[in-house]
Curated annotation (Swiss-Prot):
Any one Pfam family match given in the protein's UniProt record, by short name: Formyl_trans_C
Lineage: Bacteria, Pseudomonadati, Pseudomonadota, Alphaproteobacteria, Rhodobacterales
Gene Ontology terms, MF aspect: methionyl-tRNA formyltransferase activity
Highest taxon of source: Bacteria
Protein name stated in the entry: Methionyl-tRNA formyltransferase
SUPFAM superfamilies named in the record: FMT C-terminal domain-like, Formyltransferase
Amino acids binding (6S)-5,6,7,8-tetrahydrofolate: S109, L110, L111, P112
Claim: Transcription is one of the keywords in the record: no
Keyword set, alphabetical order: Protein biosynthesis, Transferase
Family affiliation: Belongs to the Fmt family.
InterPro entries cross-referenced by the UniProt entry: Fmt (IPR005794), Formyl_trans_C (IPR005793), Formyl_transf_N (IPR002376), Formyl_transf_N_sf (IPR036477), Formyl_transferase-like_C_sf (IPR011034), GART_AS (IPR001555), Met-tRNA-FMT_C (IPR044135), Met-tRNA-FMT_N (IPR041711)
Gene for this chain: fmt
NAD recorded as keyword: no
Amino acid sequence: MRLVFMGTPAFSVPVLDALVAAGHEVAAVYCQPPRPAGRGKKPRPSPVQARAEVLGLAVRHPVSLKGAEAQADFAALGAEIAVVVAYGLILPQAVLDAPEHGCWNIHASLLPRWRGAAPIHRAILAGDAETGVCIMQMEAGLDTGPVLLREAVAIGAEETTGGLHDRLSALGARLIVEALARRAELVPEPQPEVGVTYAAKIDKAEARVDWSRPAVEVDRLIRGLSPVPGAWCEIAGERVKLLGSRLAEGSGAAGQVLEGFTLACGVGAVEITRAQRAGRKAADAAEILRGMTLPARLD
């Protein structure tokens, strides 16, 4: 099929690769413009742009799609379907209507749960037992369109947002290829009005660990914010990111170091399995502890 691909971050790259590998004609790749990055703040192309250029695909990165010229350029591509995955721009109705069969979105949740910007983070933060990927026919509302195909996956007891991100990206790549192959037989399923939740962007204020909370909540926070933005605490005045954890045996005063990198919470305890000191690379807990001594209690 003749497609337009619209995506920006690393999550979208396996999808683009899968579409090309399946033999689809990608008429153009739309992504966010290069952003300043690194110490020199030089413009850096997005992961999708970098991959598209390697694949020899035409890349477009308009700042907006609201203008008549941008919309005409999009329509002129003559796409049968636009595949959208974490693109980052709102698609006006004229863009949604331009492809012959509309725009299909790959969304990393089991809609209508976790509509919005941060569905992977929010699923772990909420303690969901499962999540998944939906292929959705886009409409004007925020992730409200009918679902064409879905698949659920269990969330591991020690899984982080980073690990789940990679699994769902691969699942989305497989599902979109399947959905395109089965387009003629798929029946759009309207989303139910019950069970709707919204996955708001992660606020940095959420990231500080409060050891007075129950261990189950602290564990979800650490795993749900790993690797970005990263839950954190202060150890001897140094901000340390906590990037991996598991529930542990033991109890004590909130923030008390019980053994190794196991800390008491308001109820129960959490073992930190991976962390990152300021200005250093992430490391397993054992390596972190070789380089620093924990106080008797953390704030």
